[in-house]
């Protein structure tokens, strides 16, 4: 048996987002901060006593990949601190609140598809949360898949059907959502590489009036 027991580095501020995909879910749920928790391991899924935490702010346009990289660094630094505390007898584990616990279950394929009837903020969070993997996608009018890697929130309003391309500029295009309009800045057509929306527009990949997301 290990002298001090076993510890684990978990990429969330426990007890929120226990489970397999805490970074994805933090972005997808529009959280303003995430973090790392060093915890004692027990028989449950991320249910052990918490030893130390560090919080990290989540920017409006931060992606899952960017948050992952930041948490990786913070987690390594925190782990060294905790090991020193344990060896010095200074660690003070704290039990998790079951009432405050949430779970980040395994991602499923159906979660990747964009539902344009949702609010622009929710779709933006999905796109950020699935970048760089697995990627959020929609359907083009020709039935082919289009992954969307980059988006921005806008203050535009429209009465157009959700999924309708309501505007296209030299650099991006704008899609009607259930609430609001989302600016699309980076995409990946089926069987092609990621590209700026500008390149996609210039190639006549999408035009004003097209409706995305239809079967």
Mark where each language-model region is.
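Low-complexity, intrinsically disordered/propeptide-like segments
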Residues: 81, 109-110, 143, 215
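Donor/substrate-binding cores of folate-linked one-carbon enzymes
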Residues: 1-104, 108
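Acyl-group handling in specialized metabolite and lipid biosynthesis
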Residues: 105-118
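An anion-binding loop in the catalytic cleft
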Residues: 116-215
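Short amphipathic alpha-helical segments
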Residues: 54, 110-112, 180-182
């Amino acid at each position: 048996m290990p002298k001090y027991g076993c510890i684990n580095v978990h990429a969330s501020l426990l007890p929120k987002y226990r489970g397999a995909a805490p970074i994805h879910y933090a972005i997808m749920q529009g959280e303003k901060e995430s973090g790392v928790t060093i915890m004692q391991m027990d028989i449950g899924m991320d249910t052990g006593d918490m030893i130390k935490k560090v919080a990290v702010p989540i920017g409006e346009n931060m992606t899952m990949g960017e948050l992952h990289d930041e948490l990786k660094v913070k987690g390594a630094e925190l782990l060294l601190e905790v090991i020193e505390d344990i060896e010095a007898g200074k660690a003070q584990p704290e039990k998790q609140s079951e009432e405050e616990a949430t779970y980040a279950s395994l991602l499923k394929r159906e979660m990747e598809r964009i539902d344009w009837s949702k609010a622009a903020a929710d779709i933006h969070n999905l796109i950020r949360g699935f970048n760089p993997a697995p990627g959020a996608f929609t359907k083009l009018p020709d039935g082919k898949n289009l992954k969307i890697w980059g988006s921005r929130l806008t203050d535009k309003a429209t009465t157009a059907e959700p999924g309708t391309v309501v505007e296209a500029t030299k650099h991006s295009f704008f899609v009607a959502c259930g609430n609001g309009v989302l600016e699309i800045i980076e995409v990946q057509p089926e069987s092609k590489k990621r590209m700026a929306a500008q390149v996609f527009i210039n190639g006549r990949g999408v035009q004003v009036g097209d409706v995305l997301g239809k079967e």
